[in-house]
A protein has these predicted regions:
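C-terminal beta-signal and adjacent terminal beta-strands/loops
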Residues: 711-719, 740-795
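Structural signature of Gram-negative outer-membrane beta-barrels, strongest in the C-terminal barrel
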Residues: 246-250, 382-385, 397, 434-594, ...
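Acidic, small-polar-rich N-terminal luminal/periplasmic segments of exported/outer-membrane proteins
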Residues: 17, 47-179, 574
Length: 795
């Protein structure tokens, strides 16, 4: 695997769209031909596929009746593939990427996602049991004991809300049952010390009351070596517990209460310096890399490794401690003409984190973070009966939330060697708080124009108010809050002139004590036409609008970048859903074209801050194809492929990559770079997967089962500022699970990343390296190959 922008000698140019199209057409054609041959010989032996039921449109439907580009993974599939996080999930969902960054987590669908700023709400909204989880940090939470996962591509604003401009991720947890059931599953992967236990028990507590209790414990030793600390990183520990009660006094009313607590902690991070490019040579002939510059400045061994080899330099005692509590109450009442549903949700999380931000073996720069978030939501909706010509949904939604984010950029004593002696042992403390209140009314009508032709129209009105404050001040403690303010004018001048930070210290000049409010209201419509071409094939076309609210920047250092605008999208889709071969196969396809305005962007400024803004215009287009087929009673295949074309059509405020000539707009005295005509990061042209499942009896009581999953991601850029050196080659991830078992027990072997691909998912520049003329970059790798064993007991 290479992260160079240059081709390897003799290799095809897989960054050429024309070549990719030719290769892909050949592969798709060959695959279809092989599939047809297999179908022809196995059709008589194959059984029907199970019906997959989803709630993507706030009502139960077969997945083939939903006019949305959707990928569904049921609980059994999640268990078979050992999917426990969103990092795992992306390997089975085309056009879906998840990555850790230096200071957060990002999620993208069709190349659209959310940047690093904690103030951003997610363009790919995450829902658990119908409750929005709108903060980036919540992506890191483990998910467990699930009934299914639904990944919806494209805006879903009418029924899911304002922050679904790219799509929605809906997780549905397993519900209490009337029969007593349970399981215990233990997984061990010795390569990196992975140990995981999942358990659940469910059953009746009385005639009208059922309960379920599920737990997850996980720990790992890490997969990136840190010689300075003498350990592997990141070591992780997770514990989660969920209790559910289902009350059904009669056949017209039910209520489900779910309480969940999560704790997920880590020590160290999976970040390493992967390149230290010299652009000059010193008079003595030594290449001017950042490592050599640090050595010359009296910091020998600051960077001992600058290649991608799962080895990192860091001296800080890094940690990340996260706790999450959520409560959800869902009640349904049969009104006769429809069903009244109330979903009440409360969640609270806290995060404390210390990160090494200089990526060296010295104390130059650290980041200390303390974040708290609480949210209350209430949705009430009525869904009409579905056995009538005119069907409808109507409802209202309310949300209130508070985000508090305090952080310190700490300058250690070793920054003196870089020529910033006044900053030694100084902390740059930033305090941020935002309060948000949102209210929405929504409705959707479905009318049967004929027995085969349907018209669906939806509309959502949303209003939101936000109030935010931010202060930045220099203090006398680089690793602690509430320290005395710096009064030395030399220190203040160094921070403002050398780092471009506007301060609130006495004599600091700018008075960086911001307080602003914003209010916005939006109508987001959708129109869909469905036509049943046959009893088994449905064709549809749709137009949808969506928006994500604006807000106020957390991590910026200058007052001019405090507020950012809302993000909007218009999307056109057309596709088909089909059941084929008497229920033994399904084929789905969706083509799309989207126009985004004001995509919210956060980019590293090269020193210690991030600039937040909006990309003027962006266009994306492509298609998503997926299907399933039961080849025989024992063998089944699921596969999908997605193509994405992404272009900034008007974006003149991008951060410049290393030594890139500024040619964009001038903002607050700084000229930026013109990204117009470029692809965004995390936008591979081609992604796809194929999953082969094979199950057969070995004896009268013992069965053999296996799952092989192959996922492909095409070449794309992963750099925060679109540096060409951040281009990564396409890669293929192969996972395998095979085991023996009965209805009561199972033992299986697991292999993740079987081909041992070396993959980087995010890259950015090391702070201060550009000041000496070095293009030094750090990156986040995926784990290399792991093999393990899993044992389960069921009752």
């Amino acid at each position: 695997m290479t992260i160079s922008a240059q081709r390897r000698p003799g290799s095809p140019n897989f960054q050429s769209g024309e070549t990719i199209m030719k290769v892909s057409r050949y592969l798709i054609g060959a695959g279809l031909a092989a599939l047809i041959v297999a179908i022809d010989g196995a059709e008589a032996l194959a059984q029907q596929l199970d019906t997959v039921t989803v709630t993507a449109q706030r009502r139960e439907q077969a997945v083939t009746d939903v006019p949305i580009a959707i990928t569904v993974l049921e609980g059994q599939t999640l268990n078979e593939l050992s999917i426990a996080t969103l990092d795992d999930l992306q390997l089975t969902v085309p056009n879906f990427q998840v990555t850790q960054t230096g200071i957060g987590t990002q999620m993208f669908i069709r190349g659209v996602g959310t940047g690093n700023d904690p103030a951003f709400e997610q363009s790919v909204a995450q829902f658990i049991d119908g409750v929005s989880y709108g903060r980036a940090q919540l992506i890191r939470a483990p998910f467990f004991d699930l009934e299914r996962v639904e990944v919806l591509r494209g805006p879903q604003s009418v029924l899911f809300g304002k922050n679904t401009v790219a799509g929605a991720l809906s997780l549905i947890t397993a519900a209490p049952t009337r029969e007593t059931t349970g399981y215990v599953t233990a997984t061990w992967m010795p390569e990196f010390g992975d140990r995981q236990v999942d358990a659940a028990v469910s059953g009746p507590l009385s005639e009208q009351l059922m309960g379920r209790l599920a737990v997850r414990y996980y720990e790992t030793d890490g997969f990136v070596s840190n010689p300075n600390k003498g350990r592997d990183e990141p070591s992780r520990e997770q514990f989660a517990i969920r209790g559910s009660l289902l009350f059904e006094p009669n056949d017209r009313f039910d209520a489900t209460l779910k309480l969940e607590h999560n704790r997920f902690d880590s020590r160290g991070r999976e970040i390493e310096v992967v390149r230290d490019v010299n652009t000059q040579t010193l008079p003595n002939g030594v290449p001017l890399t950042f490592a050599n510059a640090l050595t010359g400045a009296g910091l020998p061994g600051a960077i001992t490794n600058s290649e991608f080899n799962f080895t990192r330099d860091a001296d800080s005692d890094e940690f990340a401690d996260n706790t999450l509590f959520n409560a959800t109450l869902t009640a349904n009442y049969d009104l006769g003409f429809g069903t009244l549903t109330s979903v009440t949700g409360y969640l609270d999380y806290s995060r404390d984190e210390l990160a090494d931000l200089d990526f060296t073996n010295y104390f130059i720069l650290t980041g200390l973070l303390s974040e708290d978030y609480d949210q209350f939501t209430q949705e009430v909706r009525v869904v009409s009966r579905q056995d009538q010509r005119l069907r409808w949904i109507a409802g209202g939604f309310y949300q209130s939330s508070t985000l508090t984010n305090n952080d310190i950029t700490g300058f250690g004593p070793d920054i003196t060697n870089l020529g910033f002696a006044p900053l030694a042992n100084v902390g740059l403390e930033r305090r941020y708080k935002t309060d948000s209140t949102a209210f929405a009314l929504f409705g959707e009508l479905t009318y049967d124009l004929t027995d085969r032709l349907r018209l669906i129209g939806g509309l959502r009105w949303t209003t939101e108010d936000k109030d935010a404050t931010r202060q930045i001040a220099a203090t006398t403690n680089p690793l602690g809050f509430d320290a005395p303010l710096v009064t030395d004018p030399v220190v203040l001048a160094t921070i403002q002139a050398g780092l471009g930070v506007e301060l609130n210290n006495p004599g600091g000049g700018s008075g960086h004590d911001l307080s602003q409010s914003r209010s916005e209201s939006r109508l987001t419509p959708s129109v869909t036409v469905e036509f049943d071409a046959t009893d088994d094939v449905m064709i549809f076309a749709s137009y949808k609008e969506g928006f994500k609210g604006g807000g106020f920047d957390v991590r910026g250092n200058r007052t001019a970048f405090f507020e950012f605008a809302d993000e909007t999208v218009r999307t056109y889709e057309a596709g088909l859903r089909s059941d084929l071969m008497a229920g033994r196969a399904q084929f789905n396809a969706t083509a799309y074209f989207s126009q985004y305005s004001n995509l919210q962007i956060s980019q590293f400024d090269g020193t210690i801050g991030f600039n937040v803004g909006n990309a003027g215009k962006t266009e994306i287009s492509g298609f998503d194809i997926d299907g399933r087929i039961a080849l025989t009673n024992e063998l089944s295949l699921a596969a999908g492929v997605s193509y994405l074309d992404f272009e900034y059509t008007d974006f003149r405020r991008g951060n410049c990559a290393f030594q890139e000539t500024p040619d964009g707009d001038i903002v607050d005295g700084v000229q930026l770079c013109d990204y117009t005509g470029r692809r965004g990061r995390f936008t591979p042209e081609w992604t796809g997967f194929a999953r082969l499942s094979y199950d057969r009896p070995v004896t009268d009581t013992i069965d053999f089962s296996s799952v092989l999953n192959v996922a492909y991601t095409g070449s794309h850029n992963i750099h925060d500022n679109l540096d060409p050196l951040g281009n990564v080659d396409g890669y293929t991830m192969v996972d395998l699970r095979a085991g023996f078992g009965t209805e009561r027990w199972e033992v299986a072997l697991l292999a993740r990343n079987l081909l041992d691909e070396k993959v980087l998912t995010f890259a950015a520049n090391v702070p201060f390296a550009s000041s000496v003329g070095a293009n030094t970059q750090y990156a986040v790798p995926l784990r290399p190959r792991v093999v393990g064993v899993q044992a389960s007991l069921r009752f």
